[in-house]
Amino acid sequence: MQTKPYKYNDMNKFNLLLVSTVLGTMSVGAVAPRGVDRANLDPSVRPQDDFYDYACGGWMKANPLSDEFSRFGTFDQLAELNRSQVYELVTGLDASKAAKGSNTQKIGDLFALGMDSVRLNREGAAPLAADLAVIASTPREKVIELMATMPGIDAFFGTGVEADMMNSSMNEMYWQQGGLGMGDRDYYLEDSEHAKAVREAYKNYLLTVAKLAGYSEADAKRLVNNTMEIETALAKAAMSREELRDPAASYNPMTIAELATRYPSVDLRRYFSLQGINDIDRLIVGQPKSLAAVDSIIANASEQALRDYLAAGYISSAASFLGDDFINANFDFAKVRSGIKQMQPRWKRALSVPNGMLGEALGQLYVEKYFPATSKEKMVTLVENLRTALGQHIDNLTWMSDETKAKAHEKLDAFSVKVGYPDKWRDYSGLIVDPKKSYWENVQQAILFNMNYNLSDFHKPVDRERWFMSPQTVNAYYNPLTNEICFPAGILQAPYFNPDADDAENYGAIGVVIGHEMTHGFDDQGRQFDKDGNLANWWTEADAKAFNELAEKLADQFDQIIVAGDTHANGHFTLGENIADQGGLRVSHTAYHNSLKGKKAETIDGFTPDQRFYLSYANVWAGNIREAEILSRTKSDPHSLGRWRVNATLRNIEPFFEAFDIKAGDKMFRPVAERVVIW
């Protein structure tokens, strides 16, 4: 699970605890063959020594990184295929002939605005002028009002509506730390060479876009210095990503009256009133220390410093939707942070806006053309097979009492399953896309529309039929607040799911994804929520202690991994995903053998069923990645890198050793006493 500050400009929802299989992403159009694709293998490597290189080395050599990507793997291949399919759908729409206000008109016009480079370059910074003028005259006491009313401004904190962790049937308002232009606090606080390089690139970026927005050289330098000073103060007060993994620590309900007394410079009653929320008397504060820092900064920083910081956040939010000068400055920063060498083509960048802002509208078109009903039926069957297998694993646990096992079964039985697409599509009739206005102004309207959509849930019962990913998304998730697992249509394709592949391969791929999401319900965060999605302790003290001891050992294993140079993996940050990877593999392997019903599966192309199962899993994570991206993801991504999702996870799994005859002395071998098995 990942806890992430809410930003309206890059998220269409406010979700504190949504857990996805991957954070990242086949121009592949070919159907995956039945049996192992030997072209993916590197036969020069013994599977007993480095299973990842053996299983994926051929693919890695055949697919070197292009300049457009800082990381590219089979997952990204599928994401690229889906992107091409969505592009065909969008370019096939004729917005000029569509009824005004229709989804077709909105999607088509929004995409066309992003593609019109001539107009974007001609307009330059003009779309920012009015809002920047407002920011430039904003007094200290109006900072909070500005944040409440200016769509797209990224500053200080985020707020949004989500299910109450203590009463998951009702929606409540949350406050979360934010306001960091570089995204992660470590970039401000660390002295590593990578962090220092990213800081310098960020300052150069701010200087460039400020001057493009009309600031003089001297004023732009002042803006950079003031912004870095405020953001560094926020970073020092922010919780680390490891600390954010504790949901209880981020649950601090306070009354509005109490907030007004403690944090007088952050007038949250006024803030919410301006957003149309007048009946709020209570707010769940994620990080009180961060809120105290915001209060202190607003009270004590100079008005000019506050204005510069607000302007920097605003310009940065808009930069991707302006002319090439802004785009190039943004990309220069990205090059340093991730190692990417070439910008995405314009059509991909333009497509991401309607795909994100009107995701379900495009999703409806996507499933009509690309998602067969038979895939949904087969997935539902697979999910139930995995549910049964996880129940067997719970029964067989030696470290858990019968009392806690009974509660675990209750939670497993209560899992809600979503496959393919929602039964009810979202209504976008309230969103206005006006091609006469600038691209950025239309994006602001979409941000405002999605913000109001979220706020409309305040103090209402939780809608458990709502989806938190669009159908065309190549991903899957578990949401502990609704105790649901979701598998969008986009991921139900090769290499994850192939109706023509044999069962061993499908269980090794999509089966593991299913098991992964189910296991999230019982990882270090998910286990703290009950069957109804409430933050509640259903464990005996002894069982909780046993779980924590096993989890700590698994975290320590991953902490020992060197990912680049002298940088280690962060096993505590990635703990939930590592637990889910292991659980997914073990449970799916059991489900596969259950499906055989005592029959012996055939050997295909010289590979036994179990060998095909584990090769299928490894091939899902085949990929190449740049060192800068490794360093960036180690800070920001709660998933381990693909290599270690394979090698480090498999080294704890006995059936894998048996499948590939791994013995003491082999590099993949781990002594029984050192293995960690949780679920």
Sequence positions of predicted segments:
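Bacterial N-terminal signal peptides that target proteins for export
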Residues: Y6-L17
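Short secondary-structure subsegments characteristic of cysteine-rich extracellular domains
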Residues: E68-V90, A218-A237, N506-V512, D610-Y614
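Intrinsically disordered, low-complexity linker/terminal regions across diverse proteins
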Residues: N15, A79, R262-S265, I284-P288, ...
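Bacterial Sec-dependent signal peptides at the C-terminal "C-region" and cleavage site
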Residues: V22-R34
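Active-site-surrounding "flap" and adjacent substrate/cofactor-binding loops of secreted or lumenal enzymes
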Residues: R46-D50, Y54-M115
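Short, solvent-exposed loop/turn elements at domain surfaces
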Residues: W59-N63, M182-G183, P495
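Hydrophobic/aromatic-rich, well-ordered segments within soluble, folded domains that form packed cores
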Residues: N40-K61, Y188, S192-K211, L575, ...
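Noncatalytic, helix-rich "gating/capping" subdomain that lines the substrate-entry/channel surface
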Residues: G92-T381, N385
